From Swiss-Prot:
Gene responsible for this protein: serS
InterPro entries named in the record: aa-tRNA-synt_IIb, aa-tRNA-synth_II, aa-tRNA-synth_II/BPL/LPL, Ser-tRNA-ligase_type_1, Ser-tRNA-synth_1_N, SerRS_1_N_sf, SerRS_core, tRNA-bd_arm
Listed GO CC annotations: cytoplasm
Ligand binding (ATP): R264, K265, E266, E351, I352, S353, S354
Lineage, uppermost ranks: Bacteria, Pseudomonadati, Elusimicrobiota, Elusimicrobia, Elusimicrobiales
Name of the protein in its database record: Serine--tRNA ligase
EC number: 6.1.1.11
Record localization: Cytoplasm
Entry's free-text remark on domains: Consists of two distinct domains, a catalytic core and a N-terminal extension that is involved in tRNA binding.
Gene3D superfamilies: Bira Bifunctional Protein, Domain 2 (3.30.930.10), Serine-tRNA synthetase, tRNA binding domain (1.10.287.40)
Amino acid sequence: MLDIKLFANDLEGVKKSLASRNPALLTLVGEITELNKTYKELLTSVENMRAKRNELSKSVGILKQKDPAAAEEAMKEVSLIKTGMSEKENMLEEIKKKISNTMLNIPNMPDPSVTIGKDEKDNKEIRKDGAAPSFSFKPLDHHAVGEKLGILDFETAAVLSGSRFALLKGDGARLERALISYMLDKHAKKGYTEVVPPSIVNEEILIGTGQLPKFREDMYALEGEPKQFLISTAEIPLTNMNRGKVLQEAELPVKLTAGTPCFRKEAGTYGKDTRGLIRNHQFDKVELVMISNSNDSFNLLEAMTADAEDVLKGLGLAYRTVELCTGDMGFSSAKTYDIEVWMPSENKYREISSCSNCTSFQARRMNLRYKNAEGKIEFVHTLNGSGVAVGRALAAILENYQQEDGSVIVPEALRPYFGKDIIK
């Protein structure tokens, strides 16, 4: 959530920043401006009524001695003022709720360093690493490679759960497990604390990280009360672990990692992406989360992105890193890097990780603060990133390491976890 004071102190700055994401957001800014204006007018009216009530209440005692009739009139007026105040105070509460609900639907403001743009066409490539493999044959997509090896079974998955689910078996299941262990071990060596969080969270937890209320249709909701949801990313429980707390600056940065199943309805139409492991309703992902002070978060974003890139370097996969433009960033993000892995069957890079600095946006929603060295209480900055999407990493390995005879070489870094060097 943005700081509501910005709408009073720097309204033009807010408009300019949010319009760089999407000009349609100016409608919500206008609603907040009008609600704030109405709120202030009502508040002034209530304060004036309260002062008048207090003045009359003080005079009643004196008037009772001197002029009982006037005292009676004053008491009637006090009663009328109380009734009017009560009505207006109720109106104030309703306006506060409207302001809060509207603010929850306004995204974070992009950092000034972010390129202004409309969509992914305006994203900026930052760097590339690794060489795409060359083949003496036409490479198959991972779906075909996995099915021929008998390690991916989408037909059975469809019988069990419907479309856009995957069933991994044998070496496919073992490769998935090896990837998760490899990633978690790699991140643990860099100071991240491994966590096994719940995969079901309460509604307010999703409000904290920004999935709700805006993206409710993308979430799998459980029936009954209290309202609970399956997590779409481990960012949700990891970032909320310290909600409502005041941390000491010496404790920062907090660095957390988890490998969890993730659940997303993915209601849109994605063409070829509905085939294979690229865009499923359930998938495994290793997540990175950092809780930072307000000064170091952008340096930590660079470090987190490097940590995610290091996973791909270790696997020998070619990738590129792009900085997202204002129009392509996620709801809670102030700055985002996407890491894209090379997919030979498509002859292009595909997203495998997204690393974001959410500044104080999520912290305000979950009331997560810290006491700085001077003793001042501030909101923390929160960062999150995929370290990385496991299914997409598995897909990239099947495609990049496939051999002409249909076998797949296991990347060296995975062999201690997997136990052999080839899948055939």
